[in-house]
């Protein structure tokens, strides 16, 4: 039976498998003309981080390539057109967190939801994280966030224990927040801490496409509320304008 949920899971798994293979290949073959692109050249956040330096001095941050800026512009453009589909359909960290939560529920671990007031407060943290990252990156002229970035850690898993010992904090975030906390609170990283999600959440407010509830056919079953990976309650709204909406389509 065709459902958008199955299509989405297929797309998520495909992108996660591909980008994980790219990370493995980079660790085994190395970079350079004969190798595989670096982790940083494939990260849209790096494009946002490098904008200030490029505009003021014409130079890229170390490790960042023009591809990062191209990716960020593309993702930002898609967000303005159809919402945060990058977060809901493509982002590897989002997929890891969501798949881990699905596995946890299959094993009988109950999904948890924080009290609404606490949830709203914590959702503001990612904007502070974004502001801090941009401030120190633009001030220092280097990728200040890199040592704490779970995306970098995921792409370096093939490097083994030596990499984990040399740069442990990113792995702490990966294993304890993206995966660990994500077992109980679905997409915990995405909801509360992701800096790229914060940037795209701002753009989401201006998106031309919004998720809408059709009152004439809605039977008030609350399925959309229960299935939303980001803890939004679409049934209480006619049009979902929440910055955290990732167009997951799990209600269908």
Identify the function of each model-found stretch.
Residues 1-238, 243-244:
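Non-ligating segments of multi-cofactor redox enzymes
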């Amino acid at each position: 039976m065709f459902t958008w949920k199955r299509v989405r899971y297929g797309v998520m798994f495909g992108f996660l498998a591909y980008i994980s293979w790219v990370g493995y290949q980079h660790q085994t073959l190395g970079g350079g003309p004969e190798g595989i692109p670096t982790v940083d050249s494939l990260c849209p956040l790096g494009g946002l981080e490098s904008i200030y330096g490029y505009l003021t001095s014409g130079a890229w941050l170390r490790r960042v390539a023009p591809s990062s800026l191209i990716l960020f512009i593309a993702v930002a453009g898609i967000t303005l057109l159809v919402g945060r589909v990058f977060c809901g359909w493509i982002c590897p960290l989002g997929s890891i967190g969501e798949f881990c939560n699905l596995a946890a529920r299959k094993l009988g671990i109950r999904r948890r939801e924080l009290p609404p007031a606490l949830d709203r407060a914590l959702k503001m943290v990612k904007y502070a994280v974004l502001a801090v990252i941009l401030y120190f990156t633009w001030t220092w002229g280097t990728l200040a966030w890199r040592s704490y970035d779970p995306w970098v850690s995921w792409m370096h898993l093939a490097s083994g224990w030596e990499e984990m010992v040399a740069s442990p904090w990113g792995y702490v975030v990966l294993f304890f927040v993206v995966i660990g906390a994500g077992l109980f609170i679905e997409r915990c990283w995405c909801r509360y801490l992701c800096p790229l999600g914060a940037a795209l959440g701002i753009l989401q407010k201006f998106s031309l496409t919004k998720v809408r509830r059709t009152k004439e056919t809605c039977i008030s079953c609350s399925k959309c509320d229960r299935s939303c990976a980001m803890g939004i309650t679409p049934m209480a709204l006619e049009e979902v304008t929440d910055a955290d909406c990732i167009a997951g389509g799990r209600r269908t």
